[in-house]
Amino acid sequence: PPIREAIREYLFAEITRYWDESTTSARASEVPSYFHTLLVPTAMKLWHLASKHSFDTRTGSWWEYIAYLIGGDYHQTAIRQHPVIGPLSNAAEAHIQQILEDMNVRPTIRQPNRATDISEVLTVQGNQGPDRSTRSDLYLKRHDGTEMYFEIKTPGPNKGQCREMKERILTVSALRKGHSTLALAGCAYNPYNPTGDADGYAWGMPSY
């Protein structure tokens, strides 16, 4: 299919460019994760020439662009780094921050629940308030008019990144109240455990 070929050509060009750049700046102390080794099999042999951190950073833009290609192929509109602007009531902003704080304390006061969290924020979100702006990594508009806003992170996001994703989901939902909107977060699949058993992961995904 054309979309598959477009993704293949994009990844080939980006990985080739990254590898050429990385061979000029050695960093010997880092070892690739299982995920990186699967993506670039030769990484284990030559990883001393590259930086794991720079690889994580670079792949973040790859996932976003691939999602953009796929979204544009299936939906009416696809835009990267799309600004979201609208009024945010003081009550909604305060409730978003309260949700985040309640999830941050130990023992956890509140367990994340997408439907409940969004519903509570929309209940206190009015039509007035200072204009606020945020940015969506990827905006898609379906043929039925539904708006989809994605916050995209690299595999295994840390606690701060998970909190940021949750805040963006709730903020976008509030800013687009009254529209047919889905605010979502996405991470590339991380096959850290070769058995594919999620219960066998060496680390737990932070919950937000």
Q: Locations of the language-model features?
A:
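Domain-level recognition of nuclease-like catalytic cores that cleave nucleotide substrates
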Residues: L182-Y208
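Surface-exposed cleft-lining segments at the edges of enzyme active sites
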Residues: K52-D56, V121-N127, E151-G160
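Nuclease-adjacent, charged terminal/linker segments that flank catalytic cores
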Residues: P1-P87
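Conserved catalytic cores of phosphodiester-cleaving nucleases, focusing on short active-site segments
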Residues: G71, S136-L140, D144-G156
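Active-site-adjacent loop/helix micro-motif of nuclease/hydrolase catalytic cores
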Residues: G156-E167, P194-G196
